[in-house]
Amino acid sequence: METKSRLLKRNPEPVRTLSRPQVTVTQPKEEPAKPQPTPDAGVGGSSLDTMVAACAVELMNARNSFHRLHLKITGPGSYAAHVAIGDFYDGLPGHADTLVEGYQGVAEKILTLKDVAPRTLDDLSDGVAYLREMYAMINKLQGMLPYSEIVNNLDLVKDAINSAKYKLLFLK
């Protein structure tokens, strides 16, 4: 009795050599240069610098304008408006500081903050209109900013504006 081998038979064709994939080593990409704002002659900085400074000044002035409005609200729904405006203006100095400090850090320059008189708000409709104007100003600035962290901080200001507007329009 003959024993059959259970071994596999070798293929008679020649063995093919496998080619290894070519590996290419690349140098790490250089970090892109920091975007440079457009020059603005006569201001001592760029137009972006000027707009960020103007936004910060507007936030600081809005604090005073809304504080005064907060103190003169009377009539039906005045308590809800009083509280809503109080919550809003309390946060504005922090938002202004965050904007200026963050921008000065990323741009590595000190902004010039000009003195501008605060706006006078006579009633709630003036306050709501001012909130809408501030929102539009911030939206425009965000569209010009190359720094995502500053854009995100400005989103928080817009969130505070939206919350105040909601409370003033719908909570009585």
Regions found by a protein language model. Name each.
Residues 41-62, 123-127:
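Disorder-to-helix initiation segments
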Residues 50, 90-91, 118:
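A structural boundary/capping signal
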Residues 52, 56, 63-70, 96, ...:
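A structural signal for well-ordered alpha-helices, especially hydrophobic packing surfaces
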Residues 62-87, 142-147:
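Helix-loop segments that flank and shape redox-cofactor active sites
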Residues 1-47, 54:
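Intrinsically disordered, compositionally biased, charge-dense segments
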Residues 115-169:
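Acidic/histidine-rich alpha-helical segments that form the ligand environment
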Residues 79-111:
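Conserved alpha-helical segments that form or flank metal/cofactor-binding pockets of metalloenzymes
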